[in-house]
Amino acid sequence: MKKEYRLQKNEEFQAVFREGRSVANRQFVVYTLKADQTHFRVGLSVSKKLGNAVERNRMKRLMRESLRLLEPNVAPNDYVIIARKPATALTQSEVTESLKHVFKRAKVWQKQGR
């Protein structure tokens, strides 16, 4: 994921948690914060409760790939995505569908593109 698409600083994460709103499904919690920019920025969080480092890194890779696929349809806001335990059992296509579902629930899904 390109640097300009990432939330990196603690203050950026805290702003999204504090001022944004959250939407969830069984696999993911997504915090959204409206922002004036041309593309979205995202921060990923996978707790140590979800498994060892290999499993957590796999989950982050799946989430990043799903975001790459969903990019044209996601509104240009700031997001923090937190993975829940059931997400570790999902395949790539299931992760993509689950994130798409939670983005639609958050009303940030823009129908267009690919």
Swiss-Prot record:
Keyword Nuclease: yes
Keywords annotated in UniProt: Endonuclease, Hydrolase, Nuclease, RNA-binding, tRNA processing
Record keyword Acetylation present: no
EC annotation from Swiss-Prot or TrEMBL: 3.1.26.5
InterPro entries on file: Ribosomal_Su5_D2-typ_SF, Ribsml_uS5_D2-typ_fold_subgr, RNase_P, RNase_P_CS
Alphabetical list of Pfam families matching this protein: Ribonuclease_P
GO molecular function annotations of the record: 3'-tRNA processing endoribonuclease activity; ribonuclease P activity; tRNA binding
Reaction catalysed by this enzyme: Endonucleolytic cleavage of RNA, removing 5'-extranucleotides from tRNA precursor
Domain of life of the organism encoding this protein: Bacteria
Matches recorded under PANTHER family: RIBONUCLEASE P PROTEIN COMPONENT (PTHR33992:SF1)
Subunit structure: Consists of a catalytic RNA component (M1 or rnpB) and a protein subunit.
Function of the protein: RNaseP catalyzes the removal of the 5'-leader sequence from pre-tRNA to produce the mature 5'-terminus. It can also cleave other RNA substrates such as 4.5S RNA. The protein component plays an auxiliary but essential role in vivo by binding to the 5'-leader sequence and broadening the substrate specificity of the ribozyme.
Record's protein name: Ribonuclease P protein component
Gene name of the encoded protein: rnpA
